[in-house]
Curated annotation (Swiss-Prot):
Its biological purpose: Component of the dark-operative protochlorophyllide reductase (DPOR) that uses Mg-ATP and reduced ferredoxin to reduce ring D of protochlorophyllide (Pchlide) to form chlorophyllide a (Chlide). This reaction is light-independent. The NB-protein (ChlN-ChlB) is the catalytic component of the complex.
Molecular function in Gene Ontology: 4 iron, 4 sulfur cluster binding; ATP binding; metal ion binding; oxidoreductase activity, acting on iron-sulfur proteins as donors; oxidoreductase activity, acting on the CH-CH group of donors, iron-sulfur protein as acceptor
Protein name in UniProt: Light-independent protochlorophyllide reductase subunit N
Cofactor note: Binds 1 [4Fe-4S] cluster per heterodimer. The cluster is bound at the heterodimer interface by residues from both subunits.
Subunit structure, as described in the record: Protochlorophyllide reductase is composed of three subunits; ChlL, ChlN and ChlB. Forms a heterotetramer of two ChlB and two ChlN subunits.
Record-linked Pfam families: Oxidored_nitro
Organism: Prochlorococcus marinus (strain MIT 9211)
Length: 418
């Protein structure tokens, strides 16, 4: 680890739950359906986050736990079987059904793993039924994707072919560009996970080299490693430098000549740095405080410091996997304060004490902090925005310059009016 100082905190948290990941997963795999076993609050959360009206028949829904279920007066498993049968009768195009656990279903101990096994035997291969937890009791919102991908891994076919596997949901256009770069480097067998169709799972084996695109896929990385795959250590593909090092990690693993890597990436890097310039001018010297929510905080901090010149006051992260994050930690400046976990009141006190120019935080904290005069950026925006890769570096920087620009405009307007 670099010279960063690490502090652990426990206490009250302010994060979304893992159900939120359904929003981007259901868009990624249009032949899959996500059935949350939860409360009306769970249903409202997903519908609001996705911005989809329920009459549009989205590829997610909620099996509502009523008071009778919570009190143990009804057989929740019988009710779940009935809901699933009705759903699959009405939506025969569903190829994969995820039963997604929630806080209520976990509190009353509904065994969704057993339910999935039972329903798989009933439907006899017509649809694949998997389960994972989206509960927020012990996890944060991005870990929903980790749970979903981990559930897929046992179904992935075995293969001995040498291949590169990109793991983690990316915007389709971004993924296509990255695959094109790898093919220019002579890496022909490139696949992605999750796939764009849930039935088209990539193969896995001892000749599979894995590049993680997201830092929150700890469990998925572990089970892929158990299947024989090699996880390539690299920073995550955020910003010019992170993306370059990420691509070079794959190139080195496939014995690609460094001169080819340089000639392929150099035009992209020059263009990206030119596009970054106006945002660097806005961000350089500004003080940054990241509250924990998405697990993207450390790669984002590295990008904003190394490439945009921001001063890092504190990096909060819900969980810190030191092995997975070592390439990122090694790039941070000495004495960077990293806080794993959260005691939200103590962290807010430190925000007020340090007076940052920009706070990256969850939606629930943004408005109160704005009311206190701080500029904020929602961390959830980083998950829904196409920010990965060299070409996207300026778009990523723009996301952080916007609130500062807005703050300047508001101050100018107030001065003019007075």
């Amino acid at each position: 680890m670099s010279g960063a100082s690490l502090l652990k905190e426990t206490g009250p948290r302010e994060v979304f739950c893992g159900l939120t990941s359904i929003v981007w997963l259901h868009r990624r795999m249009p032949d899959a359906f996500f059935l949350v076993v939860g409360s009306r609050t769970c249903a409202h959360l997903i519908q609001s986050a996705a911005g989809v009206m329920i009459f549009a028949e989205p590829r997610f829904g909620t099996a509502i736990l009523e008071e009778r279920d919570l009190a143990g007066l009804a057989d929740a498993h019988e009710e779940l079987d009935r809901v699933v049968k009705n759903l699959l009768t009405r939506r025969p195009e569903i190829r994969t059904l995820f039963l997604v656990g929630s806080c209520p279903s976990e509190v009353i101990k509904i065994d969704l793993a057993r339910a999935a096994e039972r329903l798989n035997s009933q439907f006899n291969g017509k649809v694949t039924i998997l389960n994972y937890s989206g509960s927020g009791i012990e996890t944060t919102f991005t870990q929903g994707e980790d749970g979903a991908l981990k559930a897929f891994v046992p179904l992935m076919p075995s293969s001995d072919k040498k291949q590169l596997l990109l793991v983690g949901t990316l915007a389709n256009a971004v993924e296509d560009r990255l695959i094109t770069i790898f093919k220019r480097l002579g890496i022909e067998n490139v696949d992605s996970f999750p796939p764009r169709q849930s039935t088209e799972l990539p193969s896995i084996g001892p000749e599979t080299k894995v590049l993680l695109t997201q830092p929150y896929l700890t469990d998925t990385a572990r089970v892929l490693k158990d299947r024989g795959a090699e996880i390539l250590p690299a920073p995550f593909p955020l910003g010019v430098e992170g993306s370059r090092l990420w691509i070079e990690a794959a190139a080195k693993s496939f014995n690609v000549d460094q001169s080819l890597v340089t000639s392929t990436l150099e035009p992209l890097i020059l263009r990206a740095r030119k596009a970054l310039k106006p945002y660097i001018e806005k961000l350089t010297g500004k003080k940054l405080f990241l509250l924990p929510e998405s697990q993207l905080e450390i790669p984002l901090a590295r990008f904003l410091h190394m490439e945009c010149g921001m001063e890092l006051l504190e990096i909060g992260t819900p969980y810190l996997n030191r092995d997975m994050m070592k390439p990122e930690l090694d790039l941070l400046p000495d004495k960077t304060r990293i806080v794993e976990g959260q005691h939200v009141e103590k962290q807010l006190d430190r925000v007020r004490k340090n007076q940052p120019d920009l706070v990256v935080c969850g939606m629930g904290l943004a408005n109160p902090l704005e009311a206190e005069g701080f500029s904020t950026k929602w961390s959830i925006e980083m998950v829904f925005s196409p920010i990965h890769g060299i070409d996207q570096a300026s778009d990523l920087a723009e996301l952080f310059s916007r609130p500062l620009h807005r703050h300047d405009l508001l101050n100018t307007k107030q001065l003019t009016s007075t």
